[in-house]
Amino acid sequence: MAKIAIVGAGQAGLHLGIGLLAGGHQVTMVSNRTGAEIAAGFVTSSQSMYGMALGFERELGIDYWQDGAPQYRAAQMRAADSEGHVGLFWQGDMEEPGQSIDQRIKMPRWMDRFEELGGDLIIADADMAMLERLAGSHDLLIVASGKGEIGRLFERNPARSPFTQPQRVLALTYVHRFRPRPGKPAICININPGIGEFVSFPGLTLDGPCEIFTIEAIPGGPMDCWDEVRTAQDHLAVSERLLRDFFPIEAERIEGHLELTDDKAVLRGRITPTTRHPVATLPSGALAFGIADAVCVNDPITGQGSNNAAKCAKVYLDAILAHDGPFDAQWMNATFETYWDYARYVVDYTNMTLTPPPPHMMQILKAAETDPTLARLMANSFNDPKAIAPWYYDPVEADRFLSERTQAA
């Protein structure tokens, strides 16, 4: 039985901690907020999750909302200008439904479960001194927080990080009075080329079902207008204006005017997509092992963040449960590389969506308009971006793939 400390009680940290407790290990968890404080705070994510990641939660018995929350069973992508002229549209069914649970509901419940299983939950702002104490009293220290002094422990890996600054200005909103699109509930990706994106899907929040959407503005463009926004109502008003101005087809879903689900249902920010080295050395020489966003963070444009957290937690959990030796740097790096074998596809998948699409990518997306099987493959790529390798990521493989589909038609 190992003693393991986890700093950060989010999707990855709690998932891993609960799994380790179920596997017979002793676990200390550090959170800077209580469950009650999380529940009473601002939204933290859009947390769109799909079949594989939800399945990992189900394995641990922590999928408490599987039957009571809205689900979406399709994905669609539309590229259109500000006048609503459509240049691209496809929709495909998902093999397994997606779901989004407000983390203000989810994390407090998981914290309760962690303690029910015998975990030691510490409420504190973790600093370097605390990390040193935890490293000295535990067999393994895992950092699941990518913010502040602790987040800076892990050095950027330039070979795996093509960007040095944010590629989008982000504005997240939970709303009512935004009708679902006709047909199957879907995650809807809308692109206004050169301006930005609008992503929406159903979710469950504090007062029940809602719609969750993110506006992704290209920095310096006409939707990059958030610096003077101060209040939640200002945020909502700007969101509705941008929706009407730049995504008129989606604006047709508004019933009168949008309403916030609550006065803390907004979030703004900028993320620089970054992959870091997973092992950090503390001043004492002790090691810290980073997980999920602490060492591999993507822009939310493809809805991969919470999925990555669950998948990284699954890889780490399996590796820890199978290990009977010291948790040294060699083991840490090998464990992360197991995760990276999957995560590298997520990084490419997301980064390709942030930049002007290469010709082969446009050929695939255009082909999906008239090829229902290809549209389904693209819809299910949200669940597993690796499943569309190599043909989505490599122009030569894309040509071969499309030629084979044409010959088979």
Segments the model singles out, each with a brief description of its role:
Residues N192-V266:
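Conserved FAD/dinucleotide-binding core of flavoprotein oxidoreductases
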Residues S48, D93-R109, A144, I150-G151, ...:
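Short beta-strand to alpha-helix junction loop
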Residues I6, G17, G269-V347:
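Conserved mid-domain beta->alpha element of the FAD-binding
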Residues F154-I189:
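Central beta-strand plus flanking loop segment that forms part of the substrate or channel wall
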Residues R33-D81:
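N-terminal FAD cofactor-binding segment of flavoenzymes
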Residues M1-A12:
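Beta1/beta-strand and adjacent pyrophosphate-binding region of the FAD-binding site
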Residues T302-G303, D318-A409:
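C-terminal helical "tail/cap" subdomain of flavin- and related membrane-associated enzymes
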Residues V7-A9, I18-F42:
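Glycine-rich FAD pyrophosphate-binding loop
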